[in-house]
Amino acid sequence: MRLSDFDFHLPDAAIALRPAEPRDSARLLVVRPGEGLEDRIVRDLPDFLRPGDALVFNDTRVIPARLMGRRAGRETGGGDGSPVAVEATLHRRIAPDRWVAFMRPGKRLKEGDRIAFGHDQDRACQAGMLDATVIAKHEGGEIELAFDFAGVDLDLAVAAHGEMPLPPYIAAKRAEDDRDRADYQTVYAREDGSVAAPTAGLHFTSDLLERLKAGGVSLHFVTLHVGAGTFLPVKTDVVADHKMHAEFGEVPAAVADALNAARAAGGRIVCVGTTSLRLLESATGEDRIIKPFADETAIFITPGYRFRAADVLMTNFHLPKSTLFMLVSAFAGQATMKAAYEHAIAAGYRFYSYGDGSLLFRAATDENGSEQS
């Protein structure tokens, strides 16, 4: 498959800069392969689920992982040794005092460079300044940082000085503000660690969750800490050559058991968001049994993949040539999703992290994962 197979024209105006209010008033495009499309709203979700279905959410919490700072001047002075402004988006924590991050301008950084973050009088940090040392530059553009703080002290410093890491397509149009601290967080978020929101979950309100439970749908929570790699574009023309960045996820034993029991009783597993789906697929064997999981995953789902866990997927509308558009094309079928996105664009659906949602029912596939006609 070529990257161009997943391209489509997306008008700039289609990208949402703010979420719908209230959250569950966002539009919802229901996609049943072979049965056409249906325009609804998110609060109609209970109409499409039945007693015994199991809804799976990602309960990760977004941290303010975007840090602004300056590289200190090197002793050599002048030229590339002069102080320079830098921006870091924390990606993955690897030790109490260490993160790997994506940084701009990363090419101007070297091992041993000192970075001074958080020297902002408007955001004073009681523990002191948030400084770090460049430890290593890794393959894929990641830069390893060792902070002067560790553990809880580092968490507090990042919370004091960091900004919410809005996706690039939104950040290019407006600055992050106080509203984003609430808007870019699900109502059920509880496990700190993500640098991007599991955006399908942003549509849920406490009232909608209660209505789902009242309808006999069980709610389950897993954790996948979304890394900054989710924002990176695919740069290879051959899709199979693309390498995903690893992210840490956990499926508790009790959740795995409950989901297996729900499926055995005839219920469907409904994933809220591609993060929940990717984690469950990583935790599920060829026998379609979901197992407890606590590890990194770099699963890359493209057309031809044979799904083991998910029966239904609720997800937002994704960007052209993105790994997530590849995933939904694998789930509901390439032709189906191209038609669905053409409809969504023509009908004025709002795209991307703060945009509207879609409810996708899995396409029938043969034993090789190929879509059946």
UniProtKB/Swiss-Prot annotation:
Coiled coil: none annotated. Pathway: tRNA modification; tRNA-queuosine biosynthesis. GO terms for biological process: queuosine biosynthetic process; tRNA wobble guanine modification. It is found in: Cytoplasm. Keywords: Cytoplasm, Queuosine biosynthesis, S-adenosyl-L-methionine, Transferase. Its EC number is 2.4.99.17. GO terms for cellular component: cytoplasm. HAMAP family: QueA. Monomer. Transfers and isomerizes the ribose moiety from AdoMet to the 7-aminomethyl group of 7-deazaguanine (preQ1-tRNA) to give epoxyqueuosine (oQ-tRNA). This is S-adenosylmethionine:tRNA ribosyltransferase-isomerase. The lineage of its organism: Bacteria, Pseudomonadati, Pseudomonadota, Alphaproteobacteria, Caulobacterales. The gene is queA.
